[in-house]
UniProtKB/Swiss-Prot annotation:
One of its GO terms (molecular function) is translation release factor activity, codon specific. This is Peptide chain release factor 1. Methylated by PrmC. Methylation increases the termination efficiency of RF1. It is found in: Cytoplasm. Signal peptide: none annotated. The keyword Membrane does not apply. The modification N5-methylglutamine is found at residue 237. Belongs to the prokaryotic/mitochondrial release factor family. SUPFAM superfamilies: Release factor. The gene is prfA. Peptide chain release factor 1 directs the termination of translation in response to the peptide chain termination codons UAG and UAA.
Length: 372
């Protein structure tokens, strides 16, 4: 059974959820667009926890009712209760674990939109083709979730592939869903250009960065060097007669970003600044994560982009996520954006890991207090 401490935390969340629900009916909130959106967003973030808590309560009540029926004299009622309990009792542990996961402290960046970068790695043209397929996979997944997507920059490759592409994705808690996609994605298959039928291995790097706002990252204009040039299309030919493309260099870090998707230089500059802030924000988040890891003296998997995270084996129609030992089949569906189960598995795995870390930290703090 859940401890009283856990139940109190869950009940506090439920109380806050009810307060927010009441606020949405308040005319002063409904007439204030910004506040209405803020309240709605917070309520939506709490709703899964509240629904799970209420389902758990019903489960516990149903078990209690059926256990009471075991004391009845009627043998049919007792048999029915046994059958019900055989179905209900196995649901308790998974339900309790799920509720505990909801109490894991949230990543402060989880609510943010993201900038997604996909880069072809080892494998030549085949890597470029797979990079294009991963782009389509993420765009289709975003479409399924109702997110908005905008391609910010693309470098075309051969045979319809891409060397690298940057996409802005906006919607509800995008980073919380996509953050574990960062890393090296490996593909194993027979390329269309392979005459001997040999299986080739290629790699593509995916980076998912939370989009930073001005309040998150302050960038001094003195630290920015801007170059303008003419936009180029596939093969390098100029597609614009004006210098509308923008390249920004952040002098303190050496980070370079470019944007040439828009015809307006101002729009390209604004887009490039969003990309730059996201990269700087990611560096700061990684610095904070490293500091926490060093303090705990433990390494928690974070989907680091240098980590080989996943293999797409086409001859065997199999996807394997190496971090969590997860396997599924039907790659055509995966490449069409049907990746929710993979993402859910990653979220559950890392949430459980974070919960264990938090529990160890709380235990250590308690021991220190007792010694004091």
């Amino acid at each position: 059974m859940l401890s009283q401490e856990v139940l109190k935390k869950l009940e506090a969340i439920e109380q806050r959820f009810e307060e927010l629900t009441a606020l949405l009916s308040d005319p002063s909130v409904a007439s204030n667009g910004d506040r209405f959106r803020k309240v709605s967003k917070e309520r939506a973030s709490l709703e899964p926890t509240v629904e799970a808590l209420r389902a758990y309560r019903k489960l516990v009540t149903d078990i209690g009712d059926n256990e009471a029926l075991l004391e009845e004299k009627d043998p049919d009622l007792r048999e029915m209760a046994k059958e019900e309990l055989a179905q209900l009792r196995p649901q308790v542990d998974p339900a309790e674990e799920q509720l505990k996961l909801y109490l894991v402290p949230k990543d402060p960046a989880d609510e943010k939109d993201v900038i997604l970068e996909i880069r072809a790695g080892a494998g030549g043209d085949e890597a470029g083709l797979f990079a294009a397929e991963l782009l389509r996979m993420y765009l289709r997944y975003a479409e399924r979730r109702g997110w908005r997507t905008e391609v910010a920059d693309t470098s075309a490759g051969n045979l319809g592939g891409v060397k690298d592409v940057t996409v802005n994705i906006a919607g509800d808690s995008v980073y919380s869903w996509l953050k574990f996609e960062s890393g090296v994605h490996r593909v194993q298959r027979v390329p269309a250009t392979e005459a001997q039928g040999r299986i080739h291995t290629s790699t593509v790097t995916v980076a998912v960065m939370p989009e930073a706002e001005d309040i998150d990252i302050q960038v001094s204009p003195a630290d920015i060097e801007m170059d303008v040039f003419r936009s180029t299309g596939s093969g390098g030919q100029s597609v614009n007669t004006t210098d509308s493309a923008v390249r920004l260099t952040h002098k303190p870090t050496g980070i370079i970003v470019k944007c040439q998707q828009e015809k307006s230089q101002l729009k390209n500059r604004n887009m490039a600044m969003r990309m730059l802030r996201a990269k700087l924000y990611e560096i700061e988040l990684e610095r904070q994560r490293s500091a926490r890891d060093a303090a705990r003296k433990s390494q928690v998997g974070t989907g680091d982009r240098s980590e080989k995270i996943r293999t797409y084996n086409f001859p065997q129609d199999r996807l394997t996520d190496h971090r969590i030992n997860y396997t599924r089949h039907n790659l055509p569906a995966v490449m069409d954006g049907d990746v929710q189960d993979v993402i859910d598995a990653c979220r559950t795995f890392y949430a459980a890991q974070a919960l264990r870390e938090a529990s160890r930290g709380n235990a250590a703090d308690g021991a220190a207090e007792r010694r004091a």
